[in-house]
């Protein structure tokens, strides 16, 4: 496979250079269809209405492809909550846990707006501002909508989102629509109050605390009503569901059907996070989360009904950056107060045009590799999972030792698709390999036949091979899906020639708890 020639975003050093390159390309990439010009992926999928594509094409949560290129941020202006979930424990000054409901500091709407402008100026591919806590945005409506007002006045190009439990949602539909909030996420874990009572100890509704089945029934009815009202307004709705083995894991298939029938655009089934150190009811009671195999099986079962989101990172309520990274420490209130923030919409637009060129090149590369696969692959049903070390842009561009998460792709004769991610402790710490960390890495990708990396040291390479995971660095800096397909074709050839024997892999762990990582540029390990 020949190296792809492209203009890398990381090569842009100044605004002058950026604008020169945009002018050179006239803001558009060129597709592989007879050289016909098109602005990145602006045409959208054939099965998606143009107005929907405009809403999702650069939204990293609503588009799996977009999450490789575009960033999001959350602002923590909503500390209060109107329900209690057994999987949640809100923390307001926590820096070392990566999960919903956790922030390092609470913000006023004015502080939040300045933070958004600072981030947007520093990370021009940040396209989405979401309010997701640490409580519920609609249990804090004044702060939530004041924040939206301040941001929309100065930065109308930034998409506004909120994530809610849905209890107060029907009361705020008009205001949500008035602020042009095009994306709302509702966390829906049940459509049967008998099951819901084991997830929600209480809700606070109409100045009264409700418990048991009554609480679950009210919450369910309000969630379904809110979803129906949003879809009637043309607002895209994503439904988040937490998979809790033994409680709602089988029931989530029914949830999937119920939300689809009410117009939900996307369903995101997430694994329960129940590490005891988080202090949740489920965590302290020993409720386990699902294995990687269990989670994928449920997602696969629901995929035939509607679009499934598999790239969720269950991020903090103050997350900043690409999905899978968190740059919030760069934008603390103290640091932002010292900044001179000037919002430059023209610069952001020019930068994002370059992102679209990169996406167009990626799509063309995948299509070319897919065509070759169709010509040579058999129909035996053989499929593999492949782990990928990446730091963004849809490329195999991360050193094995510096990875804090692997992206997981499933590949077969039908092509490749993203099916999830696995958090890991960084193997390279202070320039040296940590054997304990390597063990967690192996457990996290144990169901994968290979791991694609930009670079890997001899010791971890040997250890991976011993457990049957093939480390592959020959696709360094190439597009991920193109590389995954190329690896699969090579794998098929080796199986056919008798060089290797295909053997199924086992299950893998889903990482929980805080990250254990250090910032290191060492190439050791």
Swiss-Prot record:
The entry's keywords: 4Fe-4S, Iron, Iron-sulfur, Lyase, Metal-binding, Nitrogen fixation, S-adenosyl-L-methionine
Induction: Expression occurs only in the absence of ammonium and under low levels of oxygen, and is strictly dependent on NifA.
Name assigned to this protein: FeMo cofactor biosynthesis protein NifB
A GO MF label: metal ion binding
Skewed-composition ranges (Polar residues): 514-525
Task performed by this protein: Involved in the biosynthesis of the iron-molybdenum cofactor (FeMo-co or M-cluster) found in the dinitrogenase enzyme of the nitrogenase complex in nitrogen-fixing microorganisms. NifB catalyzes the crucial step of radical SAM-dependent carbide insertion that occurs concomitant with the insertion of a 9th sulfur and the rearrangement/coupling of two [4Fe-4S] clusters into a [8Fe-9S-C] cluster, the precursor to the M-cluster.
Recorded metabolic or biological pathway in which this protein acts: Cofactor biosynthesis; Fe-Mo cofactor biosynthesis
Region ranges (Disordered): 503-525
Domain (Radical SAM core): residue spans on this chain: 67-316
Record text on cofactor binding: Binds 3 [4Fe-4S] clusters per monomer. One cluster is coordinated with 3 cysteines and an exchangeable S-adenosyl-L-methionine. The two others probably act as substrate.
One Pfam family from the record: Nitro_FeMo-Co
PANTHER family: FEMO COFACTOR BIOSYNTHESIS PROTEIN NIFB, FEMO COFACTOR BIOSYNTHESIS PROTEIN NIFB-RELATED
Record-stated family: Belongs to the radical SAM superfamily. NifB family.
Residues where [4Fe-4S] cluster 1 binds: 81, 85, 88
SUPFAM superfamilies named in the record: Nitrogenase accessory factor-like, Radical SAM enzymes
Positions contributing to S-adenosyl-L-methionine binding: 87, 135, 187
Chain positions recorded as [4Fe-4S] cluster 2 binding sites: 312, 315
